[in-house]
Amino acid sequence: SGLITNIPLIKKIAQKNKPIILSTGMAFESEIVKAMKTIKKYNSRELAVLVCTSIYPCKDYMINLSKISTYKKKFKAIIGYSDHTQDNFASISSVLMGAKVIEKHITFKKMNFGDHKISADFKEMSKLIKGIRRAESIIGKSKIEPNNEELKFRKLYLKKIISKKKIIKGE
């Protein structure tokens, strides 16, 4: 994030023609666009642009995951999220919003200084990955049709009237 305005450095990196992850903390839209144009001019590989708030730790009201849908509309790139919160909720929520790449700091030992306080330890990282996989499962497919489990119940419940008590003919 802190180097998004360093166009000579971005150009040098782009010329390596490797996939690039561009974090956008503290950046204005015009700066993101300029960095992306530089990358795309010199690099034909994949580009991921991450929504990021460069505050450590980042409070919920600062996160603004709505940017994910804005980025998806405005930028031709893979969109992701760079998480600087102290739990996994924002990362998992970002997947539900459409993020395809997640950046989360990891540490061997939790400490109350530097990046350590916002970093996940190995147990938390494992929970994050499981949470992301669950979120992906919840998202499902965009087809408008019943899933296989619903189809099993379709014959039982579709166009039927069910009564709690016996109905006598003529009632």
Name each model-derived stretch.
Residues S1-E171:
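Catalytic cores and adjacent flexible loops of soluble metabolic enzymes
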